[in-house]
Regions:
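A short, highly charged nucleic-acid-interacting micro-segment common to nuclease
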Residues: 35-48
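A short small-residue
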Residues: 29-35, 66
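Enriched for short, Lys/Arg-rich terminal
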Residues: 1-10, 16, 20-31, 71-152
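A short, surface-exposed loop/turn module that caps and links secondary-structure elements
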Residues: 51, 55-83
């Protein structure tokens, strides 16, 4: 199991798919431009996500800055989100008793933050929760998560 700062990290497919895409895009960028790849948008996003997943969130998942209030509606206030710049959101839940964090979904370049838009990540994630993918129920969420995002 992957552990950081004493927390076990689990990944739902909604985040694993995006992480794999970004990792591959970052790898291609490095191959295509070994000296200038660090300025590539995919490389920057992958590094920012990696930092959030392994450092910022596990250092204190209860931090106020991760609360999303009623943006997803009152039924989903227990979901948290970490911001990457102004347009990307990483959604997760945690359980302080079992010390588990489940990363559920991160939006992509087709679903950038834009309040009121149908493709806004909050609107899309709320619909996804309503359809049960990812599950809102903690036990179901854990059952549908994996410990290594690199595995298919």
């Amino acid at each position: 199991l992957t552990q950081y700062h004493g927390w076990t990290l689990l990944f739902h497919e909604g985040v694993t798919v995006q992480l794999r895409k970004l990792q591959e895009a970052a790898r291609r960028a490095e191959q295509n431009d070994p000296h200038g790849f660090e300025s590539n948008a995919n490389v920057k996003l992958f590094r920012a996500l990696s930092h959030l997943i392994m450092e910022a969130v596990p250092s204190d998942p209860a931090r106020d800055e991760f609360r999303q209030g009623n943006t997803l509606g009152t039924a989903y206030r227990h979901w948290r989100r970490a911001k990457i710049g102004r347009r990307f959101r990483l959604f997760f839940r945690y359980d302080s008793k079992s010390k588990v964090i489940v990363y559920a979904w991160v939006n992509d370049e087709n679903t950038l933050r834009s309040a009121g838009s149908k493709s806004d990540p909050y609107a899309l994630f709320e619909k996804m929760l309503g359809r049960g993918n990812p599950p809102d129920d903690w036990d179901a969420l854990i059952a549908n998560a994996r410990s290594d995002w690199r595995e298919s």
